[in-house]
Every structure is written in C-alpha cells, then in structure tokens.
Swiss-Prot record:
It catalyses: Exonucleolytic cleavage of poly(A) to 5'-AMP. The keyword Transport does not apply. Mg(2+) 2 binds at D496, N498. This is 2',5'-phosphodiesterase 12. Keywords: Exonuclease, Hydrolase, Magnesium, Metal-binding, Mitochondrion, mRNA processing, Nuclease, Phosphoprotein, Transit peptide. Residues 1-16 form a transit peptide. Pfam families: Exo_endo_phos (PF03372), PDE12-like_N (PF21171). PANTHER family: 2',5'-PHOSPHODIESTERASE 12, CARBON CATABOLITE REPRESSOR PROTEIN 4. Coiled coil: none annotated. InterPro entries: CCR4/nocturin_mRNA_transcr, Endo/exonu/phosph_ase_sf, Endo/exonuclease/phosphatase, PDE12-like_N. It comes from Bos taurus (Bovine). Mg(2+) 1 binds at E351. Residues 203-231 are annotated as: Disordered. Its EC number is 3.1.4.-, 3.1.13.4.
Length: 609
C-alpha cells in the first residue's frame, strides 16, 4: 500500500479535477454545438496517414491516405463516403416508413413521390479560419487544430493525440493480488494517462450446461457497474470482488493533452486466491518502508516465462507443478504481490522477460514508489528497482562479460591468461551473461552514493571455471565504477550466482582470492582446464549468510543466490526469514500454486556504517 498518503491524495485531487474539467468542458461544448473529433495519425517513418471520424449516420470511418497525396483527393473521398452514409440513412428511413403497422396490421399509405437524389456534401478543411488549398499535400494539410467540415458538420482535427496501441487485462485476476493492465501508449505515457476502475454490481449468471443461452447473451441487458474508487493504473481486488468482473476506463495522455478514451472488461471474474503463499509470513516483517538509515534489499530470480513455458519445463523440470501455475498471467499475480509486500528500497531481479518488465513490473512497482532499469541478456535479462523517495539514478554501467573481456583494457591481463587455454577461452566467450551496474545517490544526503550490481552467472553445473572468469570480470568492473569513477562508494552485489558455498566462485568472492590449483579450474574436464590465480581487493560478505537452499526443484536444492555487501561501509540490520521447509514443500517443490519461481527471494535490511 502507499506510504505517502498526502502525495497520493494530492495526485488523486489533480486527476479528479482534470477529469471533472474535461467532462464540464465537453458538456458545455455540446450545448453550443461542439465539434466532433477527427483523429489524424501521421508519423514520418510511414508512407500513409490515417484519418478517423464519425459520420452523421453514426458509422465510423477509418481512412488510409498517402502522405504525399494532394488534399483534394482525400476530401473527395471523404465526400463520397459521406454520400454513401446519407444514402444508407435514407434507405433505412424509407424501409421503416413502408413497414406494416405492428398494432393494426394495416399497411401504410403508398410510398408517394421519390425523394430527390442526395447531393454530394461540400467537404472543406480549414486552418486558422482559412480554407486549405486542395493542392497542399496531406502531410502538411492535416494540422492539429484544423477544422474539417462535411456538409453542416464540423470536426476538430487532432493530429497525433495520445492513443493506446495495446490494452489488455490479465487472464487470471485474484482477490488480494494487484491487477495491472498491459498497455502501450503512442504520443503519450502511462503516467500522464487517466484510469478509473469499476466492478460489476452483481455476478453474471453462469452459462447453463450444454451451452444454452445465459444472462450474458446479446439480448440480455448490459451488466451494471459500480465505481471502486480507485483511479490508479494498478487495482487490488478484495474478497468482496470475488465472482465479479472488472472494467477499466482509461484515457491516454501525456500530461498536456488527452486522446480518445477506451474501456475494457476482464474476461473472467475475480477468483479467490490460492490461500496462504510462501511469502505471506515474510510480509509480516516488512509491513512498512524502512527509515532513511536503512536499505531494504531484495534479490530474486523470478523464473523467466521463456523458460517456464517449455515442454521440458512442464514434463521434466517441474512436472509436479500444476500447468496453470506455470502460466505467466498466473505467476505475475504472485510476483507482483510478493515484491510489493516487501516494501523494499532496492530490488534486483534475474530472469526478467522484457514484456514482464515493461507491462507488469514497471507499472505495478511504480505505483508503490519504485523506479526501474532493465538490461537484456538474450532471451531475458536483469532488472534493478530503487525507491524514488530514497534514491535517484546517477549513472548506469552495464556490461556483457564476453564483450568487456575482449575490448576493455581493464581485463587485458585476465584475457592474456585465458588465451593460454583456447578451449576454455572459446567457451567463456560464447556465454551471453551480463552484469547490471547502477550508481544511486541518496535523495536525503547527496554525499551518500552506492554502487548496486546485479547479475546472473552461467548456469551449467560443470561451468565452475566459467563462473570464476565471469566473476573476475564483474569485480574488476565494479571496482572501476566504485573506486575510479565514484571513489569510495560502497557496493551491494546481488544475483543468482549459480554457485553453492562450497564452490570456487563463492570462495573467491568471500576470501578475495583463488589459487590456480582449485578444482573448479577443471570443472568440465581436463580438455577445458584453465589454471590461474585470481584476486580482488573488496571485503565482501553474504548479507543473508548461507541458507540451506535458495533454489528448490524436484531434482536439486541448494544455495545459489546471494546479496554480497561491502563490509567497510554496510552492515546487516536484519535478515527476513526464508519460508519454512514445510511451506516450500507443501506442493512438493518450487514453483507451485503458492510460489511463482523455482528460487526464493533474499530480503535483508542493510545499514550505513
């Protein structure tokens, strides 16, 4: 929930005032013969422009015209369409006039004289009260604020107003779980748009068995809707909403102007949640946002949809998980609720699909005061979110390991060592892993800055030496950022390191060095041996210690995820307890209907020293 009620109330007041003013102006304009809308979409990268408007007969016209076409041709086409619309109206009137009287059964009088053929209406385009010449090209003629006149009807031209290019509600909507529409806005942005949520006044009658007609048939009256009182992009249904469908009324905007509003209704009604989730008990420790002296940090591999929705995942990796619980729409409900319930200041996520970041995580977490940045890897990527009231983003320094190793002089010595082992070098350079590095500055004390790193190292069980090389590149790069670019700033390094505490990678991070004879240098056999000694100057600690596991699937469980912190500048205030073993294994393993990933989030409160 919001922890800034004053700000939220002020924002709601602004939105309400804008909506009220828009409705008042619309009513005022209507009373004096307000102009209809003619919406023009014209972008330089496309050869055609689109023109959309409603004719007097109620039909809606969508036209595509070449931008390089003279205006006169477009106006002529509009006149033809208007004439056809007029003819349809006349034909409908004639048909009604000749229809037998339903009450007496007596036919109406004869048709009488035929009406005169309708003439093509005069169509003109005006700009600043002057007619636009018909030889002007469409691209130049259709300006914002121009007036299109079709016969006696005038239309105000709106060129490139904000518009939704995509608008969709999730399939699964559950009580107690945030609902965030998937949307795309052209010539605008979600933050400048208006939203209002409604719910049905009563549930729809269920469709009878056998597929017979139900209360939702076309002949049935439309369902009644009640305002929920929520005017944000994200809505969290309550238990009182179970069985009711939701409706969202939204108006695209950019902070200065608004486009045509749209409405969408949920396909399915709100369902009951899955019961107790693995994170519910953890939320008891994170009910409030921490004070300025603390940094609540989360690291979490949320399981990319690109991996969850494969036949291999369903039949081999997670055969114990109900298929619907692997679907993205379902898992997003749980992920959003889990993350928002931590009230975190920093969230580092791995295995984030691009669409999940833009359409789900960004809007949902933004509503709770967080801003985020994304780094794509290949099929998925990394996301780092920070609380806007505590931090601002100063700079980003993301790298791909294989690119940095080959091109950055910082890693010249390491590359020379690796070049002595061609087979190992080839394998290392084939990997697409990245590290996301963000420098944040405290909004309360500008002298306090922090380097936040986030990564997902190579996954293969026999890739120990590859992870060692990747970690050496990461730590050298982080040192450059935290010592050379921003001297002396502390480091928080989160991620899925795919390494248990017994591995060389973990030993290297915690102890600051690794010997050339460590067994991980031959993790994939003698052919890929690459013995070398490595060291780094950081003093790092695992903030959450060494849990028994952070990854729990049918065939494996172990600790793979860590939040490494700079011992010189940070200390641990508290670690949020992980779910109990009973909670994790309630449905055999992870993921499950009550847990959205095969990993468990690490959550801790850090304190500046």
């Amino acid at each position: 929930m919001w922890r800034l009620p004053g700000v939220r109330a002020a924002l709601r007041g602004v939105r309400t005032a804008v909506e009220r003013r828009s409705r008042t102006e619309a009513a005022s304009e209507t009373s004096v013969g307000a102009m209809e809308r003619a919406v023009v979409r014209c972008v330089p990268s496309e050869p055609k422009l689109s023109l959309s408007f409603a004719l007097a007969d109620g039909s809606h016209k969508n036209m595509q015209r070449d931008q390089s076409e003279p205006l006169g041709r477009a106006l002529s086409r509009i006149a033809t369409n208007a004439l056809k619309g007029h003819a349809k109206v006349a034909a409908a009137k004639k048909s009604r006039k000749n229809r037998p009287n339903a009450g007496s059964g007596v036919a109406c009088a004869g048709p009488g004289p035929e009406p005169a053929a309708a003439c093509e209406p005069v169509v003109k385009l005006y700009y600043r009260e002057e007619a636009v010449a018909e030889d002007v090209l469409n691209v130049d003629a259709w300006q914002d604020g121009a007036v299109l006149q079709i016969g006696d009807v005038k239309y105000k031209v709106e060129r490139n107003p904000p518009a939704f290019t995509e608008l969709q509600l999730p399939r699964y909507i559950m009580a107690g779980f945030p609902v965030c529409p998937k949307l795309g806005v052209e010539f605008g942005d979600p933050t400048g748009s208006l939203f209002r949520w409604y719910k049905e006044t009563k549930p729809r009658a269920a469709e009878p068995e056998g597929g017979g007609p139900s209360s939702s048939s076309p002949s049935s009256p439309s369902p009644g809707w009640t305002e929920t009182g929520v005017d944000e992009r994200v809505y969290t249904p309550s238990n009182a909403d179970i069985g009711l469908r939701l409706k969202l009324h939204c108006t695209p905007g950019n902070g200065q102007r608004f486009g045509p509003s749209r409405e969408l209704e949920s396909v399915c009604p709100v369902e009951a949640g899955p019961g107790t989730c693995t994170f519910d008990h953890r939320h008891l420790y994170t009910k409030k946002v921490t004070d300025d002296a603390l940094i609540r940090t989360v690291s979490y591999n949320i399981l990319a949809d690109t991996y969850a929705q494969t036949e291999f995942s369903r039949t081999v990796l997670y055969p114990y998980c109900a298929p619907y619980a692997l679907e993205l729409d379902y898992r997003q409900n749980l992920i959003q609720k889990e993350l928002t319930g931590y009230n975190a200041d920093l969230i580092c996520l791995q295995e984030v699909d691009r669409c999940v970041f833009t359409d789900s995580l960004m809007p949902a977490l933004e509503a709770f005061g967080l801003e985020g940045v994304f780094r794509i890897k290949q099929h998925e990527g990394l996301a780092t979110f920070y609380r806007k009231s505590k931090f601002s983003l100063l700079s980003q320094h993301d790298i791909a390991f294989h690119e940095a190793l080959q091109s950055d002089p910082l890693h010249k010595e390491l590359l020379e060592k690796l070049a002595l082992y061609p087979s190992a070098q080839e394998r290392v350079l084939q990997r697409s892993s990245v590290v996301q590095v963000s420098v944040l500055q405290s909004t309360k004390d500008s002298s306090k800055k922090i380097c936040v790193a986030n990564t997902h190292l190579y996954w293969h069980p026999k890739g120990g030496y590859i992870r060692l090389i990747q970690m050496a590149v990461a730590l050298a790069h982080i040192r450059h950022v935290s010592c050379d670019l921003y001297p002396g700033i502390p480091v928080i390094f989160c991620g899925d390191f795919n390494s248990t505490p017994s591995t060389g990678m973990y030993h290297f991070v915690i102890n600051g060095s690794i010997a050339e004879d460590h067994e991980d240098w031959t993790s994939n056999g003698e052919e890929e041996r690459c013995n070398m000694s490595l060291s780094h100057f950081f003093k790092l600690k695992s903030a959450c210690g060494e849990p028994a596991y952070t990854n729990y699937v049918g065939g494996f469980h172990g600790c793979l995820d860590y939040i490494f912190i700079d011992l010189h500048a940070l200390e641990v205030e508290q670690v949020i307890p992980l779910p109990s073993h009973e909670e994790v294994t309630t449905h055999q393993a992870l993921p499950s209907v009550s847990h959205p990933s095969d990993h468990i989030a690490l959550v801790c409160d850090l304190k500046w020293k």
